Amino acid sequence: METILQPKARPFESLKRKRFREWLRPSTAHGSLLHSDTLDLRDFAKPNPADTFSNLDSGHCPLVTTPIKYECPDGKSSFFRGDTKFETLFSNRKFYEFKDNLKRGLKKIRHGRNGHQSEKRCPVVEETKKSVSDNLDKPDNNTPCFDRFHTNSKEFETQFDHSNRSQNSEKAYLDNESCWNLSEKFIPFNNLKYEDLKHFEENLQSLAPATFTPIESNESLDRSDSTRGTKRSIRNDSSDTTSEKRLCLKQYSDEPESDHSMESTPSIYITKEVQERIEALSSTDSFLIEKVDFPSNKIGSSASDYESDNEYRNMDEDSINDVTTEKEGNVVIPDSNTSTVDAMEKPIEVSSALKDDTLDKDIDDASSSYSDDVETTFEPVESEELSDLSDTSSSGSSKIYTIPTFRGLTNRTNISQILSKVGKADLSQDNLTHLIKSHQKKKRCVNFRNKRFYDAFNPYVDNEEDAELSDSENISEMDTDLCIKDRSTSSVRFDENSRLLIYKKSKKLNKDETQSGYSTTEMRSILKTKMNSQHDEESQRASKCDTVGVAQFLHYFQYTEYKRQRNEAENYRLRGEQLSKYYSEEYPLDFAAVECEDSVNDKSDIILSMRATERNIGRQLKGISSQGAQIISLDEDVF
């Protein structure tokens, strides 16, 4: 009869241990010893190549195996696991042996893998040398990005020559025309050789200061070195070439050429020959002067430079004031120190703004000008003879005048000179208004730097004095530049007219509320708002006024009355101290000094005050004489 062992009950066995036990001993778990997993000792003793632990070194870490079926030494009888108590203990021992074998096997496998990888990473020195030599001969595919983009050193020179190769290999050098084209549109630097750049620089230094096409801009001011001269080109935006006015101008400067002198605009003068030719051709709309022989531009004229400069200095300055900015043109100012052979061959574009003969006679017919040593300081004055414009406001101590706007760039003429002439009645508001209207009508460029501006309103100036002053007059350098400068360029704009306020320092200025410029800000209260620190307490009291009880109210009333009575004695002492200070020797009343008509009234007022004090305190003050109102020092026991 077959005996079936039931598994032992293990109430405190964990689920994880139970599952491991079922996997390790399936026969015991199912309650049968005759399970297909039963092994014979002879089968178990044979080495299994598929077993993971069979490849390990048996001498180093021998495996402990426990069979499931055991045979006796006599070979007749055999027994299985679990038949007796000894078999059960032997089964538990097998479990621990299996655990040890498993740990050793995993450790051996891990050690074997690490050793195999180290052998691959660290080969023998001979094998390493051999592999390196093989890699040099045979390209490695581990760096495909480097193999794709790297460049051999032999190809560097070829690539450099190819990148620096000129686009136009047939043309070795550049001519003058191509140089100017390059100045407008630069060729890439990689396409120019060293010889081309060197030749380009030499051509730029040797070119004459002739008129050239301006670059795409409204107004170009080209400044070059002293060897090339100063060139200035003003673009003509007008598309109608027939209406161009052309004028030949000459540059003059007393100072030697330097980098600092080139920063300021040079003075421009017009020769008498050019003026005569312009007057002769003033009837035509446009004309062209092809060649002008300046004395300073002739070859071998170094000896007569001083005479030619004086000749340009003694010119007619009326023509300079006639230059207008309404009609624009191209003006070129050549330098006298540069060669002008090529410049004379080309036509010089000039501006004929002197055609208009209907100029302001008040300025052209002036015969003299005021001296430069005018007072730099001016005391504001008030003149009743000065008339006001419709938009000019005035008051008893101040006046506002409308004057043309000018730029105070020099120290020779400032606004104090204008004010001094207004104070002397040489310049009035009527004359200023007439001047403003004439400029607006004729679009003329007139400013206060020209001394003739003041001569136009002075009819008592001698003509001889004007002739002497005109010889030594030197026009500001920036004046002509402002006249010729193109209005279409982007620059700072100023109003044509300005407001001038004249007032007296000794009088207070009456501000007019109707004038926005003198209007004050809104009136603000000088009282400062303070936060109420007892706002919360007061709000709570107000909310509890309707809910307070009678008993609580009486209790509060009695408390306040008790507090008032307690402080009454202190209040009595404070009142007496106040009265003693009021009628004391520290502040005596000097009745002897009061000897005027109101002395009787003053004495009676003092007596009335003392009587009122006695009524308030309920007793009579001591020390007061019945015959007079003299105050005597009070003792401490008055009250």
UniProtKB/Swiss-Prot annotation:
GO CC annotations, alphabetized: prospore membrane; protein phosphatase type 1 complex
Signal peptide position in this chain? none
Which parts of this chain are annotated as the region Disordered? 110-143, 215-264, 352-396
One GO-annotated biological process of the protein: ascospore wall assembly
A molecular function annotated in GO for this UniProt entry is:
protein phosphatase regulator activity
Q: Which domain of life is it from?
A: Eukaryota
Which portions of the chain have biased composition (kind: Basic and acidic residues)? 116-140, 220-247, 352-361
Q: Where is the composition biased (Acidic residues)?
A: 372-388
- Subunit record text: Interacts with phosphatase 1 (GLC7).
Q: What is this protein called in UniProt?
A: GLC7-interacting protein 1
Which organism is this entry from?
Answer: Saccharomyces cerevisiae (strain ATCC 204508 / S288c)
Taxon lineage: Eukaryota, Fungi, Dikarya, Ascomycota, Saccharomycotina
